[in-house]
């Protein structure tokens, strides 16, 4: 560890004391209540996503995705690319670690952590693959570099060095140099979480946060 790293090291007491303060001034709204969901969970989730974008939250559509591997939870951040009445969807390689886990246990949860606004939204439910049409529609919207990256990377597999990874990208870049349209790689697509439970969380003073859960068409307020 260099001198600069030692100067900014956080000791155990500092870590224990770290906490943010929450209140109406953080998100500029009143207390989350049942009437916020009069138009359903999807309307509120879209509204909160739009609020995060307007507030300048970095990657407001990022969500922490949890899957199960051999009975053990595994999490990572992914980007929500479809949000509709059917649920939330993301795209990946079907042979990635999460793809293999979902093949065994097709159930997942995802949390949108909008810390800057003192809000979170949580979705959980069964998972299924998105349609071929949805795959092609989203693929056509991806930047060319991201398309090439999907071809170059054997997602979640070990790689010997950064140089090897760069060489793989260079190879597929040459391969598709004369093609205006890059095809969808085999084994690449998307998954959709169909919400069984949706929870909205809003931070408030003294840790007395607001939590409202939508499950089986019922609204419930949960203790923080």
UniProtKB/Swiss-Prot annotation:
| Residues given in the record as substrate binding sites | 19-22, 81, 138, 142, 207-209
Q: Write down a Pfam family by its short name.
A: PNP_phzG_C
- Gene Ontology MF terms in the entry: FMN binding; oxidoreductase activity, acting on the CH-NH2 group of donors; oxidoreductase activity, acting on the CH-OH group of donors, oxygen as acceptor; protein homodimerization activity
Q: How, per the record, is the cofactor bound?
A: Appears to bind only one FMN molecule per homodimer.
Query: What's an example Gene Ontology biological process for this entry?
Result: pyridoxal phosphate biosynthetic process
Enzyme class name: oxidoreductase
Its needed co-factors are: FMN
What is the role of the protein in this entry? Catalyzes the oxidation of pyridoxine 5'-phosphate (PNP) into pyridoxal 5'-phosphate (PLP). Unlike many PNPOx enzymes, Rv2607 does not recognize pyridoxamine 5'-phosphate (PMP) as a substrate.
Organism whose genome encodes this protein: Mycobacterium tuberculosis (strain ATCC 25618 / H37Rv)
What does the subunit comment say?
Homodimer.
Q: What is this protein called?
A: Pyridoxine 5'-phosphate oxidase
Name the protein family: Belongs to the pyridoxamine 5'-phosphate oxidase family.
Family matches, as NCBIfam families = pdxH, PRK05679.1
Pathway named in the protein's UniProt entry: Cofactor metabolism; pyridoxal 5'-phosphate salvage; pyridoxal 5'-phosphate from pyridoxine 5'-phosphate: step 1/1
Tell me which residues bind FMN.
Answer: 76-81, 91-92, 98, 120, 155-156, 201, 211
What EC number is given for this enzyme? 1.4.3.5
Other remarks in the entry:
The electron density for the FMN cofactor is weak in the crystal structure (PDB 2A2J), which does not allow FMN to be definitively placed in the M.tuberculosis PNPOx active site, but the residues known to interact with FMN in the E.coli and human PNPOx enzymes are found to be conserved.
Which reaction(s) does its UniProt entry say it catalyses? Answer: pyridoxine 5'-phosphate + O2 = pyridoxal 5'-phosphate + H2O2
Q: Keyword annotations for this protein?
A: Flavoprotein, FMN, Oxidoreductase, Pyridoxine biosynthesis
């Amino acid at each position: 560890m260099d001198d600069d790293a030692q100067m900014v090291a956080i000791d155990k007491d500092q870590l224990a004391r770290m906490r943010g303060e929450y209140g109406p001034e953080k998100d500029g709204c009143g207390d989350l209540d049942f009437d916020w969901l009069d138009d359903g969970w999807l309307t509120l989730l879209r509204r909160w996503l739009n609020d995060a974008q307007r507030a300048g939250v970095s990657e407001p559509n990022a969500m922490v995705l949890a899957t199960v591997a051999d009975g053990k939870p595994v999490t990572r951040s992914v980007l929500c690319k479809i949000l509709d009445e059917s649920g939330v969807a993301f795209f990946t390689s079907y042979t990635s670690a999460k793809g293999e886990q979902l093949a065994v246990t097709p159930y997942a949860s995802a949390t949108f952590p909008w810390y800057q606004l003192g809000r979170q939204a949580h979705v959980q439910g069964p998972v299924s693959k998105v349609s071929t049409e949805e795959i092609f529609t989203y693929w056509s919207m991806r930047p060319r570099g991201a398309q090439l990256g999907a071809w170059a990377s054997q997602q979640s597999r070990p790689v010997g060095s950064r140089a090897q990874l760069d060489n793989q990208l260079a190879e597929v870049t040459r391969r598709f140099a004369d093609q205006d349209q890059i095809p969808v790689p085999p084994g690449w697509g998307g998954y959709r979480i169909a919400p069984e439970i949706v929870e909205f969380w809003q931070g408030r003073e003294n840790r007395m946060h607001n939590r409202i859960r939508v499950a089986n068409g019922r609204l419930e307020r949960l203790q923080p």
